[in-house]
C-alpha cells in the first residue's frame, strides 16, 4: 500500500475530528456542517477500502499535523495561505432538501467513475429541475457535494452523489454523470432543466433555456418520431 495514501487518510481523519469539535461548539455554518457529514461518509468508505481503523488513524494524523506545525514558522504559514487559491461553496438546495429521505418506485442505479447515479424510472411526463451543492475554484466545479432532481411539486426523483469508497472526482466526471441522469429522465418523456448555478459552473454546453443539447441517440429518436408523424399525415391525406 502506498504510504502517502495511508498518511493522507490519517491526516484527513484528524482534520475531520478537529472540524467535528468546531461543530460541537456550534461554530460551524450550514455549508461547514454539510461538508462535515459528507466527509464522514467518505472517511468511513476509505477506511473500509484501506483496512484502517479510523480512531487509530486519527491519533497518527494528529502526530503528523503537530510535527508539521512545530516545524513551520508563522511567516511560512502566512505565505502558504496567501498563495493558496480560495474555493467558494455554492448552494442550490437547502439543508432540508439535501437531508430529506426519498424512495423510488422503479429504482435504477448506475456507477459512473467515482459518482453514483440514482433515478426513479417510474417518473413520466414531469417537469424536472436539477439542483446541486458544490464548491467552485477558478470558475469551475471543484467538488460535488450532492445533486438532486426535483419535480415541480418538490419530489426528489434522481440523485448524483460521490462514492465514499472512491474519493475525488473531476469536473468532467460530474458533467458526464449529469448527462447520464438527464438522458435517463428524458427517456420517459420528462422535461429536464438545469439550475443557473449548475449551468454556469458544471454544465456549460446548454442552451438559453438551461437544457443541454440533444445527444446523438436523442437526435436519432427525435428523427424517427418526426418521420413517423410525416408518414401518418401523408396516409391521412
Swiss-Prot record:
| Keyword Cytoplasm on entry | no
Modification comment: Upon interferon induction, ISGylated via host HERC5; this results in the impairment of NS1 interaction with RNA targets due to its inability to form homodimers and to interact with host EIF2AK2/PKR.
Compositionally biased tracts (Basic and acidic residues):
226-237
Which portions of the sequence form the region CPSF4-binding?
180-215
Give positions of region: Disordered.
205-237
Per the record, what about its domains? The dsRNA-binding region is required for suppression of RNA silencing.
Q: Which HAMAP family match?
A: INFV_NS1 (MF_04066)
Q: What is this protein called?
A: Non-structural protein 1
User: Which organism is this entry from?
Assistant: Influenza A virus (strain A/Brazil/11/1978 H1N1)
Q: What is the lineage of its organism?
A: Viruses, Riboviria, Orthornavirae, Negarnaviricota, Polyploviricotina
Gene name?
A: NS
Amino acid at each position: 500500500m502506498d504510504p502517502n495514501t495511508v498518511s493522507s487518510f490519517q491526516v484527513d481523519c484528524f482534520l475531520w475530528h478537529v472540524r467535528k469539535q468546531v461543530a460541537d461548539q456550534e461554530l460551524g455554518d450550514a455549508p461547514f456542517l454539510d461538508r462535515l457529514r459528507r466527509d464522514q461518509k467518505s472517511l468511513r468508505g476509505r477506511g473500509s477500502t484501506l483496512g484502517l481503523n479510523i480512531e487509530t488513524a486519527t491519533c497518527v494524523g494528529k502526530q503528523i499535523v503537530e510535527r508539521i506545525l512545530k516545524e513551520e514558522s508563522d511567516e511560512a504559514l502566512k505565505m502558504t495561505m496567501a498563495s493558496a487559491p480560495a474555493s467558494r461553496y455554492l448552494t442550490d438546495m437547502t439543508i432540508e432538501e439535501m437531508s430529506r429521505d426519498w424512495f423510488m418506485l422503479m429504482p435504477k442505479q448506475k456507477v459512473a467513475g467515482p459518482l453514483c447515479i440514482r433515478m426513479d424510472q417510474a417518473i413520466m411526463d414531469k417537469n424536472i429541475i436539477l439542483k446541486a451543492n458544490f464548491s467552485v475554484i477558478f470558475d469551475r466545479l471543484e467538488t460535488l457535494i450532492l445533486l438532486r432532481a426535483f419535480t415541480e411539486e418538490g419530489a426528489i426523483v434522481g440523485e448524483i452523489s460521490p462514492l465514499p469508497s472512491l474519493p475525488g472526482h473531476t469536473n468532467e466526471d460530474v458533467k458526464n454523470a449529469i448527462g447520464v441522469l438527464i438522458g435517463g429522465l428524458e427517456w420517459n418523456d420528462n422535461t429536464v432543466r438545469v439550475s443557473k448555478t449548475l449551468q454556469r459552473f458544471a454544465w456549460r454546453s446548454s442552451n438559453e433555456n438551461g437544457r443541454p443539447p440533444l445527444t446523438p441517440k436523442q437526435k436519432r429518436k427525435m428523427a424517427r418520431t418526426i418521420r413517423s408523424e410525416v408518414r401518418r399525415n401523408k396516409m391521412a391525406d
